[in-house]
């Protein structure tokens, strides 16, 4: 019953994401942990705004094996990595929004630091705009196992919280439930839009001051 409730919540989140335009042209992928050994991952090439329960494939978390023989998302290995790293993660959302994609390219360092925004409190455990939220940025790579190794290497020394960006690609975020993952996604997207607008205004102000 719990699995059905969570899958229903994930389907609703996917349809909402589709309406937001955060996964255009069948991009993005979503997943749900079932237990310590298995998860459900979206099938490759499916429009996220019109997914059904049949579009989620059973995947073995340890080795990415799909018993059905169907093809899951090409980035399944990043989902299963997160489930192996953090037992508390129960849902992962990967989106391709304009704000996340552009901001990940504008920011030249390997992390995006968000500071001074009240909406930082949309992220679990954040209590004040005076704190900083650090979102790692990884260079994009079509070799997903190699990208997963880089994510795992960072996580060994700096535990990942809320999400990470893949440069020029998009956002991965998660939560201990579908509802928390969805809240983190909405909060981060708002923060990304604020940060992008702030940088644009700063650039225009500096240009006008010359």
Swiss-Prot record:
Reactions this protein catalyses: 5-(methylsulfanyl)-D-ribulose 1-phosphate = 5-methylsulfanyl-2,3-dioxopentyl phosphate + H2O
Cofactor: Zn(2+)
Keywords of this entry: Amino-acid biosynthesis, Lyase, Metal-binding, Methionine biosynthesis, Zinc
Entry keyword annotation includes Amino-acid biosynthesis: yes
Pathway: Amino-acid biosynthesis; L-methionine biosynthesis via salvage pathway; L-methionine from S-methyl-5-thio-alpha-D-ribose 1-phosphate: step 2/6
SMART domains on file: Aldolase_II
One of the GO biological process terms: L-methionine salvage from methylthioadenosine
Organism domain of life: Bacteria
GO cellular component: cytoplasm
Single GO MF descriptor: zinc ion binding
Pfam family, one: Aldolase_II
EC code: 4.2.1.109
InterPro entries, sorted: Aldolase_II/adducin_N (IPR001303), Aldolase_II/adducin_N_sf (IPR036409), MethylthioRu-1-P_deHdtase_MtnB (IPR017714)
SUPFAM superfamilies: AraD/HMP-PK domain-like
Note on cofactor: Binds 1 zinc ion per subunit.
Residues where Zn(2+) binds: 94, 96
Task of the protein: Catalyzes the dehydration of methylthioribulose-1-phosphate (MTRu-1-P) into 2,3-diketo-5-methylthiopentyl-1-phosphate (DK-MTP-1-P).
Family affiliation: Belongs to the aldolase class II family. MtnB subfamily.
Protein name, entry field: Methylthioribulose-1-phosphate dehydratase
Annotated organism of origin: Yersinia enterocolitica serotype O:8 / biotype 1B (strain NCTC 13174 / 8081)
Taxonomic lineage from the root: Bacteria, Pseudomonadati, Pseudomonadota, Gammaproteobacteria, Enterobacterales
